[in-house]
């Protein structure tokens, strides 16, 4: 079975948030249901305000019916206090899908797929992510998504 959905890329920290919300509203009216965004550039000196703004963005996305995937990496995990065994900081933000730009090794990648929050973990299908090995060794296949690069 294949899952198809239309999506948009949105970068709320790089654009006027009012324009971003208008774009999201238009896309929702046209039947788009997925947003891809980047969650890689969290300024350390403005972390709290950035996370508050991102949470507002997530709330608006969900209000409009979007599922949101955010590109992130192990460095961001550390910055917001998340670990492969603890995705609560991402759950608190309302993230639906974490697209891993990098990995935590086999055991860490297995752990991240077994999170209790229902957050899907998206691996890059353009690279050999070794997903078959993850599943064979206990990764939760119901929380694994594969997606090719958007460019």
List each model region and its residues.
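Active-site mouth loops of central-metabolism enzymes
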Residues: 2-22, 69-82, 122-124
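Short, well-ordered coil/turn segments that N-cap beta-strands
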Residues: 2-6, 31-33, 60-68, 94-96, ...
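Short, acidic/polar
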Residues: 15-28, 78-89, 127-135
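Conserved beta-strand positions in the central sheet of alpha/beta enzyme cores
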Residues: 36, 92, 98-99, 145-147
